[in-house]
UniProtKB/Swiss-Prot annotation:
One of its GO terms (molecular function) is acyl-phosphate glycerol-3-phosphate acyltransferase activity. This is Glycerol-3-phosphate acyltransferase. Keywords: Cell inner membrane, Cell membrane, Lipid biosynthesis, Lipid metabolism, Membrane, Phospholipid biosynthesis, Phospholipid metabolism, Transferase, Transmembrane, Transmembrane helix. Pathway: Lipid metabolism; phospholipid metabolism. Its EC number is 2.3.1.275. It is found in: Cell inner membrane. Probably interacts with PlsX. It comes from Helicobacter pylori (strain J99 / ATCC 700824).
Amino acid sequence: MEGVLNFLTNINVIFTLLGYLIGGIPFGYALMKIFYGMDITKIGSGGIGATNVLRALQSKGVSNAKQMALLVLILDLFKGMFAVFLSKLFGLDYSLQWMVAIASILGHCYSPFLNFNGGKGVSTIMGSVVLLIPIESLIGLTVWFFVGKVLKISSLASILGVGTATVLIFFVPYMHIPDSVNILKEVGTQTPMVLIFIFTLIKHAGNIFNLLTGKEKKVL
């Protein structure tokens, strides 16, 4: 019993669970329910992220569809950032901050508030890692927004955005950057971000098939 109590009161466990719960806040679902009386999990792809929110609202002719989708994107991004910010604020080790980041991503994709359903996690991914690898993340965010704006294919923008940040972790750590944001110096491996990218590919498996067969829908 003492071992269980020690485990449950361990600050690392507490913050990992907290990260999962914060990431699990279903902003897209909540806003759609409150303002439009719609269950986003039963519309389109069933995802709770900005893309499905946009498509659902546009299909109903809602005039502020893009503004609502942008709000969902920002909130999903900031919840990941907030989870990691808290772990930094309370002095958790850098490697454990990555655990909190991953927990927040899993929380978004498998929300405990929606029977473990959720979204594909890209907004939360970019938000959670921006405080850990800011240079790589900001470039990845730029690629994400640029591809999304120009090509209007959300899945491709997401994959390229996270992919860019992942590729850069094999180059940026060798530059003259502070150790506090150097994944190679602090963790000794790029594995956490690589795993996040693999997870992104898995979550977008259907989209990748559609991209390869020319069936992927654009976001208008």
